[in-house]
């Protein structure tokens, strides 16, 4: 990972800043979250309360990410974001809004060309860490995935509130699994390399965006989590996710797919595509998602099974375990897992 987010400019009114800092200063909250996840180099956060102050800061200092919170006038925020993007096209800009149906309706009518992402602030600093990691993953995807061979998890979702809720859970899971994997490292340097070699996470909000990412990185795709209804060819398509997953399945019969939807009838398509199905209405969706990823995306211990009965043969925790047990693993089990890319995950 060559590019990192070191300096964040947060543009928020005094009221919004007060709401965000109920549990302490934003920079301190991010620092403690980084420490809990065993991450290095937490970013520094500079807070300003007006757009004028923001432009002054940008003129004096280099920033790697701009997060802006709209006040009463939502349109003004997006207008100023476009002005910032014209002057600093290389800086990602994220709009962080309080969630309400009224705000969602207003955002749907706005010109979003000046912003990279819109997120809903749900009161948890986990979201800020997820935003920073999402930006870093996007900045480093070209080199880390194409040249180094790092794997990718693709989330396809257009609901601002939903991806704002699920991304922190997804990153928390991936980072903690990487922590477990890094404990096998021989030294501190190798441990850090393993942490930085974790799977990338990328977010697509339209059919075309999902197709572009898949076509570019299909050889390194670890798994896909997709909604069903989102924009395709400029209009809302209630089956866009099914069409996308059908294309993916025609290219790769074994890639793990998770289809999530608030409409139960879509589970029939998931069965047809040999994909897992998650109900977005479930109160334990984050737990269900974590269990499904752990089971299907190759995290955790590896269990060789009998391909005919599904019964477990042996569970492998590390390379030493594999060396010790390779002789008792039947050829047909080894072939079953290898031919489906289970081992390479």
Where are these regions (language model features)?
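Non-catalytic signal-transmission and effector/linker regions of two-component phosphorelay proteins
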Residues: 1-46, 82, 110-117, 121-200, ...
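Amphipathic alpha-helical packing elements
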Residues: 335-345
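Polyanion-binding and phosphate-handling cores
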Residues: 242, 246-252, 265-297
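Hydrophobic/aromatic residues positioned on beta-strands within the core alpha/beta folds
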Residues: 96-98, 259-260, 280
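As written
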Residues: 107-118, 269-278
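Short, charged/polar "capping" segments at the starts of alpha-helices
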Residues: 17-20, 101-105, 163-164, 265-268
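Conserved phosphotransfer microenvironments
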Residues: 19-26, 40-42, 47-59, 63-93, ...
């Amino acid at each position: 990972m060559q590019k990192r987010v070191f300096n964040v400019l947060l543009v928020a009114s005094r009221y919004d800043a007060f709401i965000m800092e109920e549990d302490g200063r934003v920079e301190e909250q991010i620092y403690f979250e980084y420490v809990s996840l065993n991450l290095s180099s937490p970013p520094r956060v500079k807070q300003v309360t007006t757009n004028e102050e923001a432009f002054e800061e940008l003129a004096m200092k280099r920033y790697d990410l701009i997060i802006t919170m709209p006040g009463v006038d939502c349109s003004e925020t997006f207008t100023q974001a476009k002005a910032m993007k014209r002057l600093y096209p290389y800086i990602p800009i994220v709009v962080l809004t309080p969630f309400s149906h009224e705000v969602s309706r207003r955002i749907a009518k706005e010109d979003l060309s000046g912003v990279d992402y819109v997120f809903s602030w749900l009161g948890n600093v986990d979201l800020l860490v997820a935003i920073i990691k999402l930006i870093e993953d996007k900045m480093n995807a070209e080199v880390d995935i194409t040249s180094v061979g790092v794997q990718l998890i693709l989330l396809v979702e257009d609901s601002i509130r939903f991806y704002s809720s699920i991304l922190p859970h997804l990153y928390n899971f991936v980072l903690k699994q990487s922590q477990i994997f890094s404990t096998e490292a021989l030294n501190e340097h190798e441990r850090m390399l393993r942490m930085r070699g974790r799977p990338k996470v990328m977010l697509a909000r339209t059919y075309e965006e999902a197709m572009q990412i898949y076509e570019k990185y299909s050889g390194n795709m670890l798994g896909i989590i997709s909604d069903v209804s989102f924009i395709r060819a400029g209009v809302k398509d209630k089956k866009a996710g099914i069409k996308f997953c059908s294309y993916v399945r025609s290219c790769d019969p074994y890639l793990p797919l998770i289809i999530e939807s608030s409409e139960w009838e879509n589970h029939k398509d998931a069965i047809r595509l040999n994909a897992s199905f998650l109900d977005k209405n479930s109160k334990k969706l984050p737990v269900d998602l974590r269990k499904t990823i752990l089971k299907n995306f190759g995290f955790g211990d590896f269990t060789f099974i009998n391909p005919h009965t599904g019964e477990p043969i042996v569970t492998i925790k590390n390379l030493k375990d594999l060396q010790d047990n390779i002789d008792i693993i039947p050829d047909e089990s080894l072939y079953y897992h290898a031919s489906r890319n289970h081992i390479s995950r």
